[in-house]
Amino acid sequence: MNTQPHASHTDSNTLMLGRYAERAYLEYAMSVVKGRALPEVSDGQKPVQRRILFAMRDMGLTAGAKPVKSARVVGEILGKYHPHGDSSAYEAMVRMAQDFTLRYPLIDGIGNFGSRDGDGAAAMRYTEARLTPIAELLLSEINQGTVDFMPNYDGAFDEPLHLPARLPMVLLNGASGIAVGMATEIPSHNLNEVTQAAIALLKKPTLETADLMQYIPAPDFAGGGQIITPADELRRIYETGKGSVRVRARYEIEKLARGQWRVIVTELPPNANSAKILAEIEEQTNPKPKAGKKQLNQDRLNTKKLMLDLIDRVRDESDGEHPVRLVFEPKSSRIDTDTFINTLMAQTSLEGNVSMNLVMMGLDNRPAQKNLKTILQEWLDFRIVTVTRRLKFRLNQVEKRLHILEGRLKVFLHIDEVIKVIRESDDPKADLMAVFGLTEIQAEDILEIRLRQLARLEGFKLEKELNELREEQGRLNIFLGDENEKRKLIIKEMQADMKQFGDARRTLVEEAGRAVLTQTAADEPITLILSEKGWIRSRAGHNLDLSQTAFKEGDRLKQTLEGPHCFTRRHPRFIRGRTYSIDAAEIPGGRGDGVPVSSLIELQNGAKPVAMLTGLPEQHYLLSSSGGYGFIAKLGDMVGRVKAGKVVMTADSGETVLPPVAVYASSFINPDCKIIAATSQNRALAFPIGELKIMAKGKGLQIIGLNAGESMTHTAVSSEPEILIESEGRRGAAHKDRLPVALIEAKRGKKGRLLPISGSLKQLSSPK
């Protein structure tokens, strides 16, 4: 037996390996988060970007200066502030100079700085750079005491912790980065809109994100495009700080002679470029079999035929005058333009999702996902602090200068006596202080100035400067002593910057339906298979033998869906309080495991679907929750247009949504039709279907009364005089019994009667 003691956590010479590894990993993770990947809410910059801007300013590379070689700038950055590889610094410089990447480029790049088609920049020895005018928004106040500095990596120089941004740059140019355990995707926004929103929030701090979206309706991308995401979805994204917007290209239809026409694409979504789109069309019109396959599958053959039937020619006519100009010519002028454009959007990157994940370093120096109001409020807090520091810094300068000038004024009024004292004194500084009441600083200044500065003309200039500085001192004291006046000053400065640097919105915000390809396959019957763990797949045909269907380990069948309305071109709904609509053609077929439902729709908080539904819009379903409430809803009211779904059934915390039950049209006119509900305590109730409301959404009415700790577990709709009860005895034996409905019939909301079973209820259904 080993009797040696274990290393103690308090032993000064040892540390448990697990604790050391945990601490080391956390330190590494936070260094990546803070030091590389995430921007600051204060100035919108990552450390390398901040160092690039500061180094270029120190080199005097302002907008009006002569540009210098990029290699020289990179050397300055690496030598003084950023001891990493030169490629990381140069790549960051290149991105900051690309007008198709940043909405407001901060570097004016001369030479080849890459293209929107993915071409790389020339080597740093060939390109030149200087700052753009808008970079002044970050740098103009750097030497006015606005921000703190810290030593660089070797202590030889100081670098700023933040840049004193005059506008919320974190929203203007956005950011993208991947850290350890987190990532950020902040899109760019319009300067005018962001500034107006910040001013509105400064004037009225009680404004919420929905109010601020009157000024900032959506992102504004450098390349333009059209955002088609609905307004309520955009609001949800800005309120939560996470989501995705749907962006499509902008185009025009050019009419030609003899009824011919063509489509000209002039603006592309982010992350799309002309070369990528041409490659996608080539892949679809001239596809190659996948590795290990001898021929194309039917889906790819259908897509090839569709694209070849629609498109005659595609040309890239982009040039210096037209950064994006893609020309699409149809096979025939008789092709419907909407069908042509919809197919292009659905099959290429002309339409796609842009992720938004508003993660950044806050003023508390912690990474967090923030909503729109929080971002603007934190930046305003930062701006108020920087302006206050700037005012105090300037006031200190003014007071020092006033002190010097007041000493000179005393000397000017007694110039002859001053000269006499200086000539005859062994200690002129002490004598000047004694005779004229000067301070040591004033006496030092008098002894160092030239006599010509005491001429009569200089006296007039002296008095003028004194008066101007006293007026400025008064204004500065007003701003520092009155928060309202300080806020007015900030607003005035923001309005001036908006007037100087603001521009029109580039990205159109206009809601539209998502482009969906509907002609790649015939409308064929399919069977959908949903597993307990939320995996879905499809099989061709109806009435299939699924007994040999395999599932992933630990998973099993939850539900199959077929019937007269389950076809490849229909949209099944997935119920879980929210309803989600999916094009059945998007669900993979074959013998594989399928895909997680969560890859097709945005389930909230790891939820799994309760059931799948399909049918005509007028089809009705009974929706209910374990809390004993429910209502009848039309399938048409459950259609959700966005991946995040549509809230239909409201359930209290801790409650679950029960599987929906179909209610056929004949049920509403049949006086014998009953809704039947059962509980976890084996009680059941039946009541006429007419006692339950038809609603579009909500919590519904009480179906059955529940005791404390009891829940509703089963529902059914039946016109039969008997109900089929399937139960499991205490020893696991299965039982099937028929129960007259009349025995449990009562008014809606009553507690019903105990079922004549000894075990647990497994199923409640109509005998037919």
From Swiss-Prot:
Record's catalysed reaction(s): ATP-dependent breakage, passage and rejoining of double-stranded DNA
Keyword Membrane appears in the UniProt entry: yes
Subcellular location(s) per record: Cell membrane
Pfam families in alphabetical order: DNA_topoisoIV (PF00521)
Site, as annotated: Interaction with DNA: K46, H82, H84
SMART domains in UniProt: TOP4c (SM00434)
A single BP term in Gene Ontology: chromosome segregation
Keywords attached to this entry: Cell membrane, DNA-binding, Isomerase, Membrane, Topoisomerase
Top-tier EC class: isomerase
Site (Transition state stabilizer): R125
Enzyme Commission number(s): 5.6.2.2
Annotated ranges, domain Topo IIA-type catalytic: 38-521
Example of a GO MF term: DNA binding
InterPro entries (alphabetical): Gyrase/topoIV_suA_C, Topo_IIA-like_dom_sf, Topo_IIA_A/C_ab, Topo_IIA_A_a_sf, Topo_IIA_dom_A, TopoIV_A_Gneg, Type_II_DNA_Topoisomerases
UniProt GO cellular component terms: chromosome; cytoplasm; DNA topoisomerase type II (double strand cut, ATP-hydrolyzing) complex; extrinsic component of plasma membrane
Signal peptide (UniProt feature, chain positions): none
Family indicated by similarity: Belongs to the type II topoisomerase GyrA/ParC subunit family. ParC type 1 subfamily.
NCBIfam families: parC_Gneg (TIGR01062), PRK05561.1 (NF004044)
Described purpose of this protein according to its UniProt entry: Topoisomerase IV is essential for chromosome segregation. It relaxes supercoiled DNA. Performs the decatenation events required during the replication of a circular DNA molecule.
Protein name: DNA topoisomerase 4 subunit A
Annotated gene: parC
